[in-house]
UniProtKB/Swiss-Prot annotation:
Entry protein name: NADPH--cytochrome P450 reductase
GO molecular function annotation: flavin adenine dinucleotide binding; FMN binding; NADP binding; NADPH-hemoprotein reductase activity
Keyword match NADP: yes
Keyword Membrane: yes
SUPFAM superfamilies in the cross-refs: Ferredoxin reductase-like, C-terminal NADP-linked domain, Flavoproteins, Riboflavin synthase domain-like
CDD domains to which the protein is assigned, alphabetical: CYPOR
Catalytic reaction list: 2 oxidized [cytochrome P450] + NADPH = 2 reduced [cytochrome P450] + NADP(+) + H(+)
Residue stretches making up the FAD-binding FR-type domain: 277-538
Length: 695
């Protein structure tokens, strides 16, 4: 009997599973995994030593009847949880608390009181996985052998006393949309819990996350009011935090945070381990421009990690902790009437024992806005509405009311323009919104989050340096009246300009406090941490690999090829290494054009780089077109158990590549197109198709 290759086996599996699915009406289909979001969870989430991990005890001790759990990676789910808590308290009189899922244990969830309610606000991350702070909860609640204190089995419906509400944050450009909330909802229902209202789903891929959330929550509140006999009342702003100006302190006092991320950094003695809660202040060893076009920038940076105990593996991600641009800091302070007291020291405290202060304190208005608050993000309709009571005049108030009530008008005037909160208010009136409490701004805006970049170097080749490859965002969106500028990439461009001799760097007219708080980042340093990824080379270097990475999607593949070239130089057997790379023009944005020649010499005919230049001819050519042209090569390598990698844009490129690959497999095997698509799905689940994509 002829030996079956990997895809032959997959074909048989697909046909078998298809038959099983037909006869069992799909009951044997396992839901695979789906990526959403790529960033870190809130930095103050971990429960402090000595505090209870019993959520029921915590609710009883603090007099709460509503807990809003969140699983968040970028801060959005946490923000929605906070908004639900505030609304539940102010509109319906609920005694609410927000809870990080990793702060509690769940073995006694079967004792959750019938007169209380639990919310689950859950983002999907990675390959359909829970966010970092939700892993233990997810594994527990969806486990086949889930065990509660009562000892009741799943068949005995141990969670029959639990009433819950669920909302998920997902992205429809990925294969398994909102997998996290769907899995948890199914598990809770199976265990006997009673969901109130529908399980809401927000779609970041369609750009409708905020409107999905707003559309879901009104009928949810109606259902919850009926279930718990709640009476709606006129919502009046009740601060979660107190913000007190402290005249006894000055910015020069060493107890005042001026942008330091942690107490260790404030004291001048930061220590590892470095993580999403504690960044390493890393030196930028080298920085250079990769594009030759004058109107666009793409940066190559080498970030030093020697002596830090930070480690990485080829294919991992590095997080860059950015700083807001000076012009946006000034705009924000002016709009809210606090520009003249920007250096006043403030103390921030939670007014509720369960409230976590998201900003290190004491600090100053300037430091809070520059280093800690996400002031440049597009503003939400709900947050704009919350400013109605604080409008400077009746005309402004009427405009804010209209923006809050009319989503189409809000889309035209605010969303289409990609305005942040200060820009939106400037568009309404030139008068300052001086009456807005700073506490409301802390509550309504996310913590300034790190941004993640695929590492473009090999840890085998340079273990003490991490390379990144980043396009600087500066674009005029359709319908926008201003240029939208990337928060982190322009900050990095300023650092690059400074390192390369510019005494006054101002990328795209922006300036930054690039020496950091108290000049602690002087000498060109940047706060970073490493996030490990499953996007990895085969452990056996003789295995073939196929990589598709247009634009900066080539970043991790530079690391892959760098590593294989080093292995080949050391005498190791290296398998076929195929890269499909695309850009606009070979003379403008062909990333690492000369470097590929060096690797070609080391790898010889093992390395094949297939290019697609989209703007060199009248007909645009993309990587998916080149993939089709080289269908025989791709098919042959897949038969040799090649791993297929995609990095870059999820909404268009990755989806097209996925489709083309399915067509190639189906055609080479004489199968219907839908069977080819199913085989790509099986490649995903087996790890032979890997993605590192973003939307």
């Amino acid at each position: 009997m002829a030996q079956l290759d990997t895809l032959d086996i997959v074909v048989l599996v697909v046909l078998l599973v298809g038959s099983v699915a037909y006869f069992t009406k799909g009951s044997y289909w396992a839901v695979p995994k789906d990526p959403y979001a790529a960033a870190n969870s809130a930095m103050n989430g971990a429960a402090k030593t000595g505090k209870t991990r019993d959520i029921i005890q915590k609710m009883e001790e603090t007099g709460k009847n509503c807990v809003i759990f969140y699983g968040s990676q970028t801060g959005t789910a946490e923000d929605y949880a906070s908004r639900l808590a505030k609304e539940g308290s102010q509109r319906f009189g609920l005694k609410t608390m927000v809870a990080d899922l990793e702060d509690y244990d769940y073995e006694n969830l079967d004792k959750f009181p019938e007169d209380k309610i639990a919310f689950f606000v859950l983002a999907t991350y990675g390959e359909g996985e829970p966010t970092d702070n939700a892993v233990e909860f997810y594994q527990f609640i969806t486990g086949e052998d889930v065990a509660f204190e009562s000892g009741a089995s799943a068949e005995e419906k141990p969670l029959s006393s639990l009433k819950y509400v669920a909302f998920g944050l997902g992205n429809n450009t990925y294969e398994h949309y909102n997998a996290m909330v769907r899995h948890v909802d199914a598990a809770l229902t199976k265990l006997g819990a009673q969901r109130i209202g529908t399980a809401g789903e927000g779609d970041d891929g369609a750009g409708t996350m905020e409107e999905d959330f707003l559309a879901w929550k009104e009928p949810m509140w109606a259902a919850l009011s009926e279930s718990m006999n709640l009476q709606e009342r006129e919502a009046v702003y009740e601060p979660v935090f107190s913000v007190i100006e402290d005249e006894s302190l000055s910015p020069e006092d060493d107890s005042v945070y001026l942008g330091e991320p942690t107490q260790g950094h404030l004291s001048g003695s930061p220590k590892g381990p470095y993580s999403a809660h504690n960044p390493y202040i890393a030196p930028i060893v080298e920085s250079r421009e990769l594009f030759t076009a004058k109107d666009r920038n793409c940066l190559h940076m080498e970030i030093g990690i020697a002596g830090s105990n930070l480690t990485y593996q080829t294919g991992d991600h590095i997080a860059i902790w950015p700083t807001n641009a000076g012009v946006e800091v000034d705009r924000f302070l002016e709009v809210f009437g606090i520009e003249k007291k920007r250096h006043t020291v403030i103390n921030i405290k939670g007014l509720d024992v369960t409230a976590k202060v998201p900003i290190p304190t004491p600090t100053t208005y300037d430091a809070a806005v520059r280093f800690y608050m996400e002031i440049c993000a597009p503003v939400s309709r709900q947050f704009v509405s919350s400013l109605v009571p604080f409008a400077p005049d009746e005309e402004s108030k009427a405009e804010i009311v209209r923006l809050g009530n009319d989503k189409d008008y809000f889309h035209e005037k605010i969303s289409n323009q990609c305005f942040n909160i200060a820009q939106a208010l400037q568009n309404i009136t030139s008068k300052p919104f001086s009456a807005v409490p700073f506490s409301l701004l802390i509550e309504g805006l996310n913590r300034l989050q790190p941004r993640y970049y695929s590492i473009s170097s090999s840890s085998l080749v340079q273990k003490d340096k991490i390379s990144i490859t980043a396009v600087v965002e500066s674009v005029r969106l359709p319908g926008a009246s201003h240029i939208v500028k990337g928060v982190t990439t322009n900050y990095l461009l300023a650092l690059k300009q400074k390192q390369n001799g510019d005494p006054s760097p101002d990328p795209h007219g922006l300036t930054y406090a690039i020496t950091g708080p108290r000049n602690k980042y002087d000498g060109i340093h940047v706060p970073v941490h490493v996030r490990h990824s499953n996007f990895k080379l085969p452990s056996d270097p003789s295995k073939p690999i196929i990589m598709v990475g247009p634009g900066t999607g080539v970043a991790p593949f530079r690391g892959f090829i760098q590593e294989r070239a080093a292995l080949a130089e050391s005498g190791k057997d290296v398998g076929p290494t195929i890269l499909f790379f695309g850009c606009r023009n070979r003379n403008e944005d062909f990333l690492y054009k000369e470097e590929w020649k060096v690797y070609q010499e080391k790898l010889g005919d093992k390395l094949k780089i297939i290019t697609a230049f989209s703007r060199e001819t009248a007909k645009k050519v993309y990587v998916q077109h080149r993939l089709q042209e080289h269908a025989d090569l791709v098919s042959d390598l897949l038969k040799q158990k090649a791993t297929f990698y995609v990095c870059g844009d999820a909404a268009n490129m990755a989806r097209e590549v996925n489709l083309v690959l399915g067509q190639i497999i189906a055609k080479s095997r004489g199968l219907p197109a839908e069977k080819g698509e199913e085989m790509v799905k099986h490649m995903r689940s087996s790890g032979s198709y890997q993605e590192d994509v973003w939307s």
